């Protein structure tokens, strides 16, 4: 089927327009400020434009002789529509004044079904983080975006600058063990990023300059992510980067920042620096571009061999319109380097405080000499062709690669190395068709095919590693690991709408997975959804319900196959089964006037055959920890999610609150074993999952200095609450290993269970434009300097982190 795509793609049904007419104007808010990036479209056509930095737009070559409806749309504002009629050669001026509004039912969402669809038709809750919000929230990683912004999102605090938070989950995730993002699939401009399935960490801090992000869509839960297939059980994050400027004027931006971070382990403060530059513009009416670079240097917050964390990121975008087709080509390149750290050195403090006289001698060994370097290139091509206003096709081709080199030098001058090459290539083709019927019924159909091919090649030399015939090819002084997986998915979704009020969704994905040479067969994932819009006075409500049985999560190579590192040994488990899930959710969205929004969702999800790290087989007397991965029975996640937005003059209030009841279901293996008593009993709460999370964000808009400089700024305070959670008392656990008068505890001993108290972290952010070209900003994270050791005492959180910087725009 794929071989016909090139021929199919360059068939065009668009006719050559006459000179036609031109529509131009300016889009402003209620204060007369220009709205950059607003979309102005002619309804029921493929014609439209986005406003430039001054709010100006222009639409050329508009066929004349018939009436049109011209609509202006901007996130956070009411859509404005007016009727127009053009004559041949006429230049029609249409200005818009847009009123702020939290009513976002007509906002276009892409993440749920790949194609563009209004939020009113979505049966699952979607969180959209706009460019305006991102400017208030300097981000360093994926979870920095989600934490506090998305109901049901939770992560432990990070322990190194710019690093992903540990074990991020949405709605409790699946196993939550060893999965950096808890089965959240991440896309950048439609291209799937490397993830846990190929042993890679998909943090956007590695390659994306935060100032290059246009908006982010977050779709939580397996009911909404069904069409995306395997490894998306907890949800979808779709990041959209910026296109070129809508204006012929070239816009240059520069950011300079200095970071000061409290390092509790070093008992000192460490310094970091960041510089970024971007350039955007438009060479012709149909071609625009965007280029940028970002450079960061951070001192280590852990005992190290003296090397800093260095990162250089470049990005570029070229956007073109050719007749009825749009082409977006984007690339990102990043280079990074850092030294080695010790995760054990600071345990000497506990050794003294708790009398660990049997502690190993190697805890205070000097950190080895060497470094870790990586190069991460990426590429995406989006081709969309409109056959008519209600029918278009899209082809997305992309690649995400990460190459790393681990180099270690011995005291004798010898060198060992580990070279890792991760690669993922994505191709996604779909078409989207809307058909209106005379009886006010509309049919909206999307169908497509998605192919993902991933690989993980590891070449190591003079490194002591265990060998396995399924895992390694041996050479004289090196070993080669070649793992690959592929996913082929066919998907379709139909939405039947009535009077723009009621929407019924039917969707299904059929996919085939092959991981490291093993065929996991064919899997079918259906979904159903219903949404209904109603009005009562100034109250608008949207009732919604969804059910889905999402894609499987096949075991990863690092779980099923043996491996060995400097610290631990995975004995492997080739009999692992894929994870599976299904669930439903019901809820509603409520809008009171333009300034109040409430979202309520109840969900019930069942996970089967979850895969989890099990170190119970470890012999404490050996230097390296031994572990393997096993399947357990059921996880039942139930809960409530609430989100509130409101506005009082210059004050915006955003709040989320989530109640999560995550418990073990039936497990025929471990529930009959007394060694696991208290951990996996049916109905027992899971470890490391908080009972509740909440966020309160207060953002105050500051007025501009004068009538010539109206940009102003904002002051934001964030309060993040993490509720009680069950976990291990790690200090007591290690007492059993290293304290001679304490009997050792097994890893799953109920005697080491403890309930960690709730805590609150505070973040303060602010920015202000002193001129139209110069702004200063401040970001203070973890003001309370909270340290969380609930998951591990070898990697505690950072202390307070303060960032001060300047923004320049010309």
Residue ranges and their predicted role:
Residues 280, 294, 319, 540-541, ...:
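Conserved C-terminal beta-signal and adjacent last beta-strands/turns
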Residues 262-276, 363-382, 416-503, 547, ...:
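Outer-membrane beta-barrel transmembrane domain signature of Gram-negative proteins
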Residues 606, 628-726:
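Gram-negative outer-membrane beta-barrel transporters
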Residues 57-60, 191-220:
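Short acidic/polar hinge/loop motifs at secondary-structure boundaries
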Residues 28-31, 38-43, 73-78, 87, ...:
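Short, acidic, small-residue-rich periplasmic hinge/interaction motif at the N-terminus
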């Amino acid at each position: 089927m794929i071989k016909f795509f090139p021929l199919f793609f360059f068939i065009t049904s668009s006719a050559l327009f006459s000179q036609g007419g031109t529509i131009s104007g300016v889009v402003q808010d209620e204060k007369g400020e220009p709205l950059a990036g607003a979309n102005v479209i002619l309804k029921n056509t493929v014609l439209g434009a986005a406003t430039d930095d001054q709010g100006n737009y222009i639409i050329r070559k508009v066929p004349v002789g018939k009436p049109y409806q011209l609509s202006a749309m901007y996130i956070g504002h009411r859509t404005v529509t007016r009727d127009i009629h053009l004559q041949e050669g006429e230049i029609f001026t249409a200005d818009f004044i847009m009123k702020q509004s939290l009513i976002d039912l007509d906002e276009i969402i892409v993440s749920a079904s790949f194609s563009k669809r209004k939020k009113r038709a979505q049966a699952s809750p979607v969180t959209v983080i706009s460019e305006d919000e991102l400017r208030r929230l300097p981000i360093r990683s994926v979870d920095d975006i989600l934490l506090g912004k998305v109901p049901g999102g939770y992560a432990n605090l990070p322990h190194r600058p710019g690093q992903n938070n540990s074990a991020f989950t949405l709605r409790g995730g699946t196993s939550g063990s060893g999965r950096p993002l808890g089965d959240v699939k991440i896309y950048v401009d439609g291209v799937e990023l490397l993830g846990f399935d190929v042993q890679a960490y998909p943090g956007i801090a590695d390659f994306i300059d935060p100032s290059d992000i246009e908006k982010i869509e977050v779709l939580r839960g397996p009911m909404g992510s069904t069409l995306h297939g395997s490894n998306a059980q907890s949800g979808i994050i779709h990041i959209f980067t910026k296109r070129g400027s809508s204006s012929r004027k070239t816009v240059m931006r520069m950011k300079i920042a200095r970071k000061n971070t409290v390092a509790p382990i070093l008992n000192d403060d460490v310094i970091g620096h960041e510089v970024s530059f971007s350039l955007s513009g438009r060479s012709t009416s149909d071609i625009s571009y965007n280029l940028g670079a970002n450079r960061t240097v951070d001192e280590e917050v852990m005992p190290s061999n003296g090397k800093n964390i260095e990162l250089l990121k470049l990005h570029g975008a070229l956007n073109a319109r050719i007749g009825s087709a749009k082409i977006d080509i984007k690339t990102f390149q990043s280079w990074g380097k850092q030294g080695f750290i010790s995760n054990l050195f600071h345990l000497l403090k506990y050794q003294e405080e708790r009398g660990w006289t049997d502690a190993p001698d190697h805890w205070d060994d000097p950190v080895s000499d060497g470094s870790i370097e990586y190069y991460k290139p990426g590429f995406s091509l989006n081709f969309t062709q409109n056959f008519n206003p209600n029918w278009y096709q899209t082809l997305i081709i992309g690649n995400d690669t990460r190459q790393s080199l681990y180099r270690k030098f011995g005291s004798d001058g010898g060198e060992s190395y580990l070279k890792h090459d991760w690669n993922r290539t994505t191709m996604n083709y779909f078409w989207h068709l809307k058909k209106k019927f005379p009886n006010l019924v509309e049919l909206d159909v999307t169908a497509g095919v998605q192919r993902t091919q991933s690989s993980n090649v590891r070449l190591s030399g003079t490194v002591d590693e265990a060998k396995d015939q399924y895992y390694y090819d041996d050479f004289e002084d090196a070993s080669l690991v070649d793992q690959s997986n592929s996913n082929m998915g066919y998907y379709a979704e139909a939405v039947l709408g009535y009077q723009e009020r009621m929407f019924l969704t039917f969707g299904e994905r059929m996919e085939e997975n092959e991981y490291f040479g093993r065929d996991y067969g064919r899997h079918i994932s259906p979904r159903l959804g219903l949404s209904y819009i109603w009005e009562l006075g100034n109250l608008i409500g949207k009732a919604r319900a969804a059910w889905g049985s999402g894609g499987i999560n096949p075991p990863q190579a690092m779980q099923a196959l043996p491996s060995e590192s400097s610290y631990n040994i995975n004995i492997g488990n080739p009999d692992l089964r894929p994870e599976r899930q299904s669930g439903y959710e019901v809820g509603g969205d409520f809008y009171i006037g333009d300034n109040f929004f409430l979202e309520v969702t109840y969900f019930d999800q069942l996970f089967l055959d979850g895969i989890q790290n099990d170190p119970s087989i470890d012999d404490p007397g050996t230097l390296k920890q031994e572990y393997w991965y096993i399947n357990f029975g059921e996880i039942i996640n139930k809960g409530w999610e609430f989100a509130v937005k409101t506005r009082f003059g210059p004050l915006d209030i955003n709040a989320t609150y989530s109640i999560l009841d995550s418990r073990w279901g039936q497990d025929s293996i471990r529930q009959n074993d007394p060694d696991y008593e208290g951990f996996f009993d049916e109905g027992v709460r899971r470890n490391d999952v908080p009972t509740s999370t909440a966020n309160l964000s207060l953002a105050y808009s500051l007025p501009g200095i004068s009538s010539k400089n109206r940009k102003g700024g904002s002051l934001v305070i964030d309060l993040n609450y993490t509720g009680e959670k069950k976990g291990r008392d790690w200090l007591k656990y290690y007492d059993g290993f290293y304290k001679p008068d304490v009997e050792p505890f097994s890893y799953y001993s109920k005697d080491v269970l403890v309930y960690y108290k709730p805590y609150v972290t505070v973040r303060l952010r602010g920015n202000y434009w002193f001129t139209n070209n110069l702004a200063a900003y401040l970001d203070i994270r973890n003001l309370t300097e909270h340290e969380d050791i609930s998951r591990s005492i070898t990697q505690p959180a950072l202390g307070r982190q303060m960032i001060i910087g300047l923004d320049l725009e010309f």
